[in-house]
């Protein structure tokens, strides 16, 4: 199914096989982000941690209490569905570059068990995103870390912004399949990508006081070999600064042009 950006399996909790399937799927597809959740009985803060070290998912705790609209009874549910809704709401309101944290969890009565400031200080560095109840402020998601130990991909919004940028650029340059692989095409592709990234920077998603501090785009003989050019393979190198000006996360995209066999 195309255009999926978030994956959440409501029945996948804790360190079970379905959770592992979600992580494996997101890592293999490399264009979507998973929402993982603690098990219902996971209450030992000292031993709680994400079930996998991955930058393609985030882990949430604890379960939530909701009122069943049919019976009127309060039931406990895993947090993944509500968190997925918060992702979608934040994306629509602010953009994918905004961290889905300090967001009110709507439609819940309470959290399954209280999460203290001390719990937060233990769990957050491990990549456990806590859901907490604050007097007068409601129940909120109080963390936006991925389940990764890699500092580059520590935060959900940075990882998801990168996925969004790469996917958008790949989709927005598919037209090159009809074009000859020459310097004129490289200049057009470079300008197309720069125009897109300038819009992203102006929206506040990239850091830097100038576009040069926020991103760079290369599409020339330094990014392609003669063999690439002759075989119709166009390669661009792109750097973006999602957290600090001029500190670039670099990636490459490639497309087949009209010169490909």
Task: Report residues per predicted region.
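Structured, hydrophobic secondary-structure cores that serve as assembly/anchoring elements
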Residues: 1-261
